[in-house]
């Protein structure tokens, strides 16, 4: 489960050694690119397992687009050293998308300064403080992510997104089943977004139902994740590693 997220060839023994070392020195940071990949792969699996366990304890009736997938949370606020120490926001976002596999439309925010534990403690004394911190810019708005649920064949168009900016310009992009697309939207801008599912894809309102909304700018903008839910990684190592590299490149490396 760990090696499937790697783009390099690493022996199981090397991974075990890294895990033992990390257990002994939890505050250590990756010294090489290989170590960084192993640590991020561990982070994906740890978060996936933790979320799976948490879902079993959620109350009945929490809305989901499909059984055993992440409920429709908005917003998703995440923190932790693996996310905050990632060299790029694109890597942080991809870890979250791979591990959580959200569906529908979600805003993903990163606690890059590890403020959440302190704010959680402070909330007992001042319940408004965490809200003020969220609005202060102390957290990084990573992206608005749209993840359609679709059973279409690989390569089929499943979603068309149109962004109308304040200057009147319009950006249009289509995402295919299995694809990952990005529409840049700088922080500070607010645009009108129209999402039109195709071939009965569902983004939260029902199969084929269009959504119109306003979205604000973020570090990575609008991300259209058509890779499928649940995310099914191909078994061929060479093709899988090439695909993961492509996803990283799409999100900025």
Regions found by a protein language model. Name each.
Residues 1-253:
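Helical "lid/coupling" subdomains associated with nucleotide-phosphate turnover
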């Amino acid at each position: 489960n760990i090696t499937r997220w790697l783009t390099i060839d690493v022996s199981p023994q090397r991974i075990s050694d890294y895990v033992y070392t990390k257990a002994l020195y939890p505050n250590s940071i990756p010294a090489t690119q290989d170590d960084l990949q192993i640590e991020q792969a561990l982070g994906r699996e740890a978060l996936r397992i933790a979320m799976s366990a948490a879902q079993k304890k959620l109350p009945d009736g929490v809305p989901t687009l499909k059984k055993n997938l992440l409920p429709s949370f908005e917003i998703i606020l995440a923190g932790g050293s693996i996310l905050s120490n990632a060299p790029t926001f694109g890597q942080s976002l991809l870890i979250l998308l791979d591990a959580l596999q959200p569906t529908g439309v979600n805003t993903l925010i990163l606690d890059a300064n590890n403020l959440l534990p302190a704010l959680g403690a402070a909330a007992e004394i001042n319940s408004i403080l965490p809200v003020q911190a969220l609005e202060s810019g102390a957290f990084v708005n990573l992206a608005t992510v749209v993840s359609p649920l679709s059973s279409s064949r690989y390569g089929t168009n499943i979603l068309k997104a149109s962004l109308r900016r304040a200057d009147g310009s319009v950006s249009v992009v289509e995402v295919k089943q299995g694809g990952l697309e990005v529409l840049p939207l700088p922080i500070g801008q607010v645009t009108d977004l129209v999402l039109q599912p195709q071939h009965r894809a569902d983004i939260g309102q029902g199969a084929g139902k269009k959504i119109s909304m306003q979205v604000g700018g973020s570090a990575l903008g609008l991300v259209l994740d058509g890779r499928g839910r649940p995310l099914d990684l191909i078994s061929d190592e060479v093709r899988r590693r090439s695909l993961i590299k492509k996803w990283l490149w799409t999100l900025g490396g």
